[in-house]
Every structure is written in C-alpha cells, then in structure tokens.
Amino acid sequence: MSSNTVNQRVNFASTKNPLEYPDFLEVQLKSFQDFLQLDTPPEKRKNEGLYKVFAENFPIADTRNNFVLEFLDYYIDPPRYTIDDCIERGLTYSVPLKAKLKLYCTDPDHEDFDTVIQDVFLGPIPYMTDKATFVINGAERVVVSQLHRSPGVFFGQSVHANGTKLYSARIIPFKGSWIEFATDINNVMYAYIDRKKKLPVTTLLRAIGFENDKDILEIFNLAEDVKVNKTNLKRVLGRKLAARVLKTWIEDFVDEDTGEVVSIERNEVIIDRETVLEEVHIDEILESGVQNILLHKDEPNQSDFSIIYNTLQKDPSNSEKEAVLYIYRQLRNADPADDASAREVINNLFFSEKRYDLGDVGRYRINKKLNLTTDMDVRVLTKEDIIEIIKYLIELINSKADVDDIDHLSNRRVRTVGEQLSNQFAVGLARMSRTIRERMNVRDNEVFTPIDLINAKTISSVINSFFGTNALSQFMDQTNPLAEITHKRRMSALGPGGLSRERAGFEVRDVHYTHYGRLCPIETPEGPNIGLISSLCVFAKINELGFIETPYRKVENGKVDLSDNGLVYLTAEEEEEKIIAQGNAPLNDDGTFVRNKVKSRQDADFPVVEPSEVDLMDVSPQQIASIAASLIPFLEHDDANRALMGSNMMRQAVPLLRSEAPIVGTGIERQLVRDSRTQITAEGDGVVDFVDATTIRILYDRTEDEEFVSFEPALKEYRIPKFRKTNQNMTIDLRPICDKGQRVKKGDILTEGYSTEKGELALGKNLLVAYMPWKGYNYEDAIVLNERVVREDLLTSVHVEEYSLEVRETKRGMEELTSDIPNVSEEATKDLDENGIVRIGARIEPGDIMIGKITPKGESDPSPEEKLLRAIFGDKAGDVKDASLKASPSLKGVVIDKKLFSRVIKNRSSKLADKALLPKIDDEFESKVADLKRILVKKLMTLTEGKVSQGVKDYLGAEVIAKGSKFSASDFDSLDFTSIQLSNWTSDDHTNGMVRDLVMNFIKKYKELDAELKRKKFAITIGDELPAGIIQMAKVYIAKKRKIGVGDKMAGRHGNKGIVSRVVRQEDMPFLADGTPVDIVLNPLGVPSRMNIGQIFEAVLGRAGKTLGVKFATPIFDGATMDDLDQWTDKAGLPRYCKTYLCDGGTGEQFDQAATVGVTYMLKLGHMVEDKMHARSIGPYSLITQQPLGGKAQFGGQRFGEMEVWALEGFGAAHILQEILTIKSDDVVGRSKAYEAIVKGEPMPQPGIPESLNVLLHELRGLGLSINLE
C-alpha cells in the first residue's frame, strides 16, 4: 500500500526476526473450526469435536434391538440474520444444525418397515463470527479457554502430623471414577475409589485377576515357589512364608428356598504369612494337602517392597471372589445379587469404554510417565497401568523417583472453545438419545421416521445455558482492539472443573519456569484473581492434546538452524532438561555463536555453557511476553509490578476522537490490528473499485478455475461501520484509508479509527511531558494538564449509549408507544415523533422523555357503563399511566440514531394481501434457483465433456449415473445435488476436485437463496423477530462527547497512572526556550520508587522522534540502547537525556534546575469522573430502615459513617450531628416537618425518633421482650 497509509518505523531490533507472528486469534478460530470440521468432507473428518460426539452416541437402538437409528453426516445451513441484525434485535447469531440420519429395522416381523434416510433439524447452534466472538441475545461474548489439570496419573506427597511422609498416586480420567493409591503411617498401601471408599491395594489386585498371594508377589518378583515334600521343606527351614498356607475343602448344603444342593468352597488358614518355618510346621503343611508353598526371596532390595507384605497382612480377602465381594460391599454397602453382577460393577469402574475414558491426553500422559507402549486407542485403564503405578509409588517411597510438580505445564492443559462446546453437546446428545430410546420402545408397532424421534429443544437448551450462564462464557471486553484480542487469548484456571479463588494457594498463582514462552509472567489481574487468569504468549500455540507449545530453533554442534526446518514447537514436557540459548545471543551469518560462552536456560536454572552443549535457541526475545506486555516499549527497564499495571491499563484506554499512533512503538502494533479483525482488510489481491465514507468495493483477482467454480461475483462490497456502539459503550467509527484504483494485497488494512491509525494500534496521544513538580498540583501521582489538550480535543472521546423500551401485552390490555402521554406538557413531548420516539439530532438533558409509552392502568376493571361512556366520549386518559423512558440524572447527549422493531399485528385485509404476496415470493425464488441450476448444469457439461462416468452415487449408495456411461445434460437436470456423493465422478483427479468445488458452491448459494426466502416470508407473516413476549421494541442511541477534565484517570504504558488534578491555561504552563508550553507535567517522584525507568527512555526517544518526524519500533528485550538514544538526541540537536531548562509560565523566569522534557504516549482510561460523580438532595429511601439508599445507580446518598460521627463529636458540633443522624437520614416525621418549615420560612422543628431505633425495638419485641419508650 502507499506510504501515506503506512507508518514507516526505524527498528532497533538486533535479531532480525525471521519468524512471523502467528495469527493471534488462531486459539479461538482453529478450535471452533476443528469442532465443526465443515471444510472437511464427511469421510475425511477426524474423530474430534462434534463428529466425535455423534460417533460416540450413535447408533441408537431400542431395548430389543429391533430398530436402529444410525448417524451418517451433519451439516449446517446459513444463518437467517446477519451479525449486525442480531446485535440490533437482541437475537443470537446461530446456524441451524442438521443431521442426516438413517433408521432401519432388524426385526423380520416388521417387513413393511422401509429404511428411511432423513435430514433432521437438531436445533440452532451459536456460530462463531470471524472475530472469534459469539453473539448471544444481542451481546458479543467470548468463551475463554480454561487451564485445568490434565487427565493422567499424578504422584504427590503429604506429611503426616507425626512427620511421616505419605505418598499418593491419583489417576484422573476425562470421564469416570477417580482412583487414588496412597500409603499410610503403618506403611500399608490403600486404594481409594472416588475419594471415599478405602480398600487395601492387594484386594484390588486380586479382583482384577491376580487371585492369590503368589500372583501378587510374582508381579514384584518377590517370591519363590517351593513344591511340598518332606525333603524340600527341610531344606527351607528358617525362611519366611510369603503367603498363607490355606486348607481348602468343598462343603455341600441344602438351600431351604429351592431344595437344591449347593456346593461352597471353604478356606482355613493353617499358617499365616510372615511366619518363620520351623519343624512343627512341616507336618501341618503336609496334612493340609497343599501342593506348593510360597517363600520370600533372599534379595537385597527385599526391604523396598515391605509395603506389599504389610498390605497383604491387612488384606481381608484370600481369593478373587472374596476380593470382588469385598469391593462391591465397600462401594454399594450391600451384597450383590450374584458373582457376575459384582464383577461387572468392578469392570464398569475402570475397564468399560462406556463408563471410563482417559481420553487421548490421559493415555498419552500415562504412557509417557510410566514408559508404557500401550496403544493410544486404549482409552480405559489396563492391569499393566495399575501395576506400573504401584511399582512407581514403591520407588517413590524408597526415594528412587520424584513426585510430580502439579504447576508444571505438562500437568495442566487448555480446554479451548471447541472442547467446551463438545462437552456441552455430549451432555445434550446423551439426554436426547435417552428420549429417542424411550420413543422407540413406545412406538414399537407403528411406522415412524427419524424426525418423530427427535426433540430439537434438548440440545439447544444445554447449549443456551452454557452460553448464558457458564463462568467461562463472558461478556466481551470491547473497550479497544487490544482489550478484545486479549480477552480472546485469556487462559483462566477458574470455572467449572477448575479452581476456586478461595482454595487457590500461592503455588498455583506463581510464575513457573515452564511458563516461559507459553503464559505471560506479566499480564494477570491485580486482586483476588492474580495468577489464576493469565494470557497466552505472543508465539505460543495450543496443540491437539491441549498443551501449550512454544517455538525454538534447533542447535546442533553449536550451529543454529535458521531455516524453516530448524523450527520446532515444544510442550513443557518435551523441553525438560534441554539447554536453551537466549533469543538475542549474537550469531554469525552461518548460524554459529559469536561468543565462546553462551548464556542459556535449563529448566529453572541459568547456566553459561559452551556453544556445543546448546540444544535449542529461543526464536525471539519477545517470546516470553503476551501481546499487551509486548506493546510496552523499553519493558526491559520497568519493574514487573508496574509493567503488569501498564499492560492492564492499555486495555482500558478509551478510543479517542482522533487516534494517533505512538512515536515510540514496539513493532507489533500493525499485526495486532490486522488480527483483531476490527478493521476491514483485503481478503485477497485486487483493485479498489469504489470508495466513499460508508462503502468500499474491491474487485478481486481470480484464477480461471476459481472463476469457473464460483457462483459469486468477483466484486465484493464492504460497509464501513459508523458510530457503532461497543459492549462498553465506546464508539466504532471507521474511515477508509485506501483510494479508488489502488492495488491491494491480501491482508492490507483498508480503514482506520477505533483506536487505530494507518493500520497500527493507536490507544492514546503523543504529548510533550515535563518531569517536574508544579505548585504541588502533581503531588502523589496527580497530573497537571495544558488547557490546549482540552481545547483541541486531543483527549476527547465519544461514547454511545443505547436505551430501549419494550411494548408487551399486559393483562389489562396492550401497551402503546405514543407521543400523547397523559399529564405531560407539550414542551416535554415536542421532540417526539408519532411513535413517541425522540427525533435524531435532539439534545437530551436529565429528565427528558426519550421514548413515550402508555400502559393500561389497573386500579379496577371498568364497569360496562364506564366502558360505554368511554367508547362514546373517547376518554382514554383515565385508564392509562405514563410508562415513558426518561433520561437519568447524569445523562446528557445527542440522539444519533433510533430504531423501531415490531411484530406484524394482522387484520383481515392485511392477511389477504399477504396471501397474494407469498406466492409471488415463491415464484421469484423458484426462477432464481432454476437459473442457478442452469448455470451449474452448463458448467458441469463443460467439465465432464468427453469423460466417462465412474459411477455417481447417492447417499444410499445407489447409482444415479451408471458407471461407463457418458454424462448428459438430462442426467444432471434430474439430479438432486444435495444428496449426491461428490467423490470420483471421473477418472481425472483435477476434474473431480473442480466438480466437488462447483457443486459445493452451488449448494452454498442455493442455501443462501433459501435463507433469503425464509427471511422474506417471516418479515411478511410475523414481522421483525423479537425475543418472546415482546410486540414492539424501540431503541434510541445517544452519543456523549467527553472532553478530558479534572478527576479523569490517565496513564502511560509503564504503569504510571494518575488523576488530572488541574487544567492550566496554556500561558501559565512551563515552556521551553523556544516558547513551546509543555502539554502535561508529571511528578518526578513517581519514577524512582516505582522503578519504571522505561518511561524516561520513551520520553527521550519520543522527543527525538517528534523533532525529526521519525517513528521508532523498539521491540521488548531487544530495543534501543543508551547509545542509540544518545545518537538520536544528537541527531535531533537535543541535550543528552533531554535535560532541558524550562521557564515559568507565570513569571517567564528560567527554573534553577534542568528537567527531563520528552514526548510520552499518554492514554485516557475508562474511569471517567462523569460516570462516577454523583449528588443527591432527596431521593429513594430503604424500605425498612428508611435511610437513603447507597450508590449512584440507586441515586443514593453519602454514608455518614462511624468515623465521620467521631469527627463532628471532636468539634462539638452537636446540632449538625443531630440533624445528620435524624432528619437528613431516617426520621420520617422530621423529614416532612423540616420540608414544611423550609417552605413556610419557619425555624427548624425538633427532630423525632429515627426509624432505625424503631427497627431495633421491633427486633427486641420479636425476641419476646416487652420494650416501650417512656
């Protein structure tokens, strides 16, 4: 684009960063795309997102397996309304989700039942806009990604009160029961199922198939089997028994209920385990008839496994059957019906795919942790997993392994939007499949179709409650583009399934070494959420398992691979133990290190090593920070706490009337604007065909193939938003920065405004600042402003507020919008139109009527006589009351827009007119579709000319164009393209691809026409779509122009915030030697203790830039040095460090000391005094205490609290104090008497009893105490 639309910047980066920034919204957009997989043909869809949810819930069969409902495919239709329509009308921007379902019968008795394939509507699903937001009930919302504990196995330790270390292993699945293995102070290992049921771990091992002690001990290679005979027994005297010696026999008894003979196996313990074998035992063993006995092995690591022996001692069971029974009783507190049902319960706990799911992540983590090679498809626990976990736990006890660090990012993963939606869908579909099954069972004998089985409300109610009430679905912060993009890249540890503020300790909130390049160590809120909400780093990505990855360059033999192949994205786990060089380590052209020692990072350590030892290198010094922190120039010179405030306050910067990009930037500003999607950008290469204040049209370049398969014109029109309101009542008002005939490339930014200038982020203004005290007015961070800033509207912003009023039908009758309001003067309604809505351009003052509405009064129903009289004389005033919308006490502004939406209220004639109109609309649609199909058939004929069909099939697999036949126009005319398989029509791959694209574009265009038809019909028959129960809705938009004034909050980018304390006349401000007055005076004492020296660097470089007309980019940790500053100040002819002697504006004399005078980028923040200032004389009172309410929203009073009372007592001001505590507060009688006295000019009456005393008396009487005032 031309240089007049792009800011050229001098870049100080020493590392010319070859790695492009990733798309900053990829986190959200890619996740949602993977959830729907709309661009992928059904047969190639991955088993994730929505497809996976369908695959897991279908096929659904009835209880007798007679009918089966199978899932074939899903698709979506275009949305009915545009995003803007939805925002205006308070609707949800959603698309209809439809599924192709197949219902068939397997029962031979139902021969008459044909297989049915139907497209079934499953409800609307909110659709993500290209800005990665959702429009829910007219408001833009963002679904924040959640950081939670990854499924898998975790090893931890705790310390018992007596000082013993207790170890535990916990297996966390995606779905199913938690199981924990833990040791106790007696060195016994227990398994806890779902955190409550406790059983010895050996009981669990028996139940899963290691039936006897021998099997259990052999797992750990602890026992030796000895065959029982006298010789062998004599040889092993003195050794310990590893397992009990059991005598087994069968006992028969008669079951009294059935009369059957039942056999039962009985066990008797002859010798207990851990007994040392002596002579006396030999005969006992021989008599018991045991074939083998088990002895401990004499091995050095024997003692390591003492916990297994101790656990066997505690084990109440001796066989699998007993173990299964024991576990069943623990879980259910009852006896099982039979052995099989008990086994099934245990099997369902961990080994059933329906009930238990580790997920890909859980399996991956368990394999990685325990060095297993189990297949990734095995999503349930295996016996091997349980054994390996027990073995690892034993290693922990013996200090041969380490416990896991729960805050390590390999143990935390991200749930993105797509996954959260999948989980909600799974809940909705599970509910729906239950109702489908029930309906199938009920309708056994009748003929039914998939549509009869499905209730679309089930899914949409779950999805709606997720978007409406879930803690992670948030009202988007839309103060400026940075606030939007940061909100979408936020990672929250809160929310369902996450932590809670109260329980989160310091460790979870702390910065961890694995956050490097993944989560920003700087940007997090101050207050109770600190450390629980973080922001994704600039280069970070989230992989398919949900772990955060960051890029590095490979280093081999001391040489950095600077090619694209040398780039690797690593998770925290893959980065373990690696030695990583800094991003700004100096390199030679061939990629070798300049210095023979390299500063590097290895986990939490920072060794200085030889180049040959380095494994990886950072891609950029900015890798460590998030977008907001990367926007702070000279961040490396600021204290982290102030940088945190700086990055948080940039999100609160109000878009100004005229935006101005910073002189000193960091080079990331352009990418941020492009990726925020708040401006109009070119979708491809092309030429600007037309441009004015409201419209841009671009003619895009297209290849022949693209032109051929498309049904859209190459000319695309964009509407430029004007004075559009954001969620935070800021203004989006864009203007074009391209010219007619100009060539544009893909990604070029075509507009500016809403905190952007020439395609760069522009949150504030470059102001001339002096660091010096000024008459005490800038004490404690206060700011002194030059009046010029106010006069020239440098820091003026426009805020748009929307006010709406709804018309409903009440029990008493219909409400009505009108300018004819009872008991209101003509003066008050002079600006209202016939619908009672204020005219555009009217100035609004507090108390003015903005929308006039009357509503039927409800004292009593009128009698028939009254009704008759009213009908004759038309007396309406008596039965309605004024329900108009009036301006609140602080509202002043200008009406810039108004809208009225209404449902159609039908009378007979209008119904007839509609009847005539609807067929015309249908005919118009039919002819458009016929034209469209004609073009399609013509193009298909061109494509398939001379080619032979390879067999074109429909969804049922039936051939509709036979294999080997030639394609003909009549064949194509008769095809239903919506139910055709699009793969391999011909033997040529290129033609097949073109056919596929052509037919897909045809279907897309057809669906758009269909949606338009539905929209038109809806508009005629029903009118505007409005939320339920509302007949009309009027909206008024009021713009307020806010100049900066005393009490407004301002800040720089380094956490240097303050309140404007005085606006000083231009001639009274300190001025430079050439007579230029400074714009703003800041207190120099705000710098040293805050340690944000970056602001001084910025001021010095900014002034050099302003003098020379140059803009700079100084990337963080790689920016301008002191030498660079000196060089540029010398070039600009400024003193070193811009230490300048100023003159006093009042006297004209020069000050004694030089002060730093520079140009700093200052922001005006959203905390404006006009929104906060509030005063009241009389107003509402609390119902019970009769004291004035509190807060501006309630038009409340100021609390005169305990300490204020002490102050008046200290002065002895008894009368004032009495007045404040009685008639000015809650003495109800006194209030009215005082009013009377003021009106009549009489002296003030004596105050009465405050209401709060009466409340106290009532409370005491409520306790049964008889209390009276004498």
Swiss-Prot record:
Keywords of this entry: DNA-directed RNA polymerase, Nucleotidyltransferase, Transcription, Transferase
GO biological process: DNA-templated transcription
Reactions listed under catalytic activity: RNA(n) + a ribonucleoside 5'-triphosphate = RNA(n+1) + diphosphate
Enzyme Commission identifier(s): 2.7.7.6
Keyword Transferase annotated: yes
GO-annotated cellular components: DNA-directed RNA polymerase complex
InterPro entries in UniProt: DNA-dir_RNA_pol_bsu_ext_1_sf, DNA-dir_RNA_pol_bsu_external_1, DNA-dir_RNA_pol_su2, DNA-dir_RNAP_su2_dom, DNA-dir_RNAP_su2_hyb_sf, RNA_pol_bsu_bac, RNA_pol_bsu_CS, RNA_pol_bsu_protrusion
PROSITE patterns documented for this protein: RNA_POL_BETA
Pfam families, sorted: RNA_pol_Rpb2_1, RNA_pol_Rpb2_2, RNA_pol_Rpb2_3, RNA_pol_Rpb2_45, RNA_pol_Rpb2_6, RNA_pol_Rpb2_7
The UniProt record lists the keyword Cell membrane: no
Molecular functions (GO terms): DNA binding; DNA-directed RNA polymerase activity; ribonucleoside binding
Assembly description: The RNAP catalytic core consists of 2 alpha, 1 beta, 1 beta' and 1 omega subunit. When a sigma factor is associated with the core the holoenzyme is formed, which can initiate transcription.
PANTHER family: DNA-DIRECTED RNA POLYMERASE I SUBUNIT 2
HAMAP family: RNApol_bact_RpoB
Family the entry assigns: Belongs to the RNA polymerase beta chain family.
Biological function: DNA-dependent RNA polymerase catalyzes the transcription of DNA into RNA using the four ribonucleoside triphosphates as substrates.
Protein name according to UniProt: DNA-directed RNA polymerase subunit beta
